[in-house]
Amino acid sequence: MLTNVVEYRKTIGRPAPGRVLIATETGELKESTKRLEPAIGVVSDTYGLEFGKSVDENLAPVAMAGRVLAFPFENREGFRIGDPVCAAPGGTVSLMTREEVKIWPDRIVGVVTEIPGGLTQGKENEVYINGRIWIKV
């Protein structure tokens, strides 16, 4: 299931697919640690087109456009299609209030597009959901 375009970016550690990343002072990326941090993107395991790949093992495929699976901070049953989300602790996404969207529109990581059921998804069950939700970035 190929749903997004990624750019390989240098990371601190090895963030798992579905984790939200923020930039450090040196330009390396790391998992978000608090709500409303300015995020760069979400690590993807469903990409179909990639840019910037090299043999460097500290590179992660970061979704730049399309749909990507992301770990929710709150209970996933509280998310609805169309909800805007921001970075949250542990590299997760959090629901944004209408007030937060007005004050910090630049902090929107994406918009919820699907809350999948089951453990896998795709024609051949090739995508492991692992409690994640789909967002459009």
Language-model features: where?
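Extracellular receptor-binding modules and their adjoining Ser/Thr/Gly/Asp/Asn-rich linkers
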Residues: 1-137
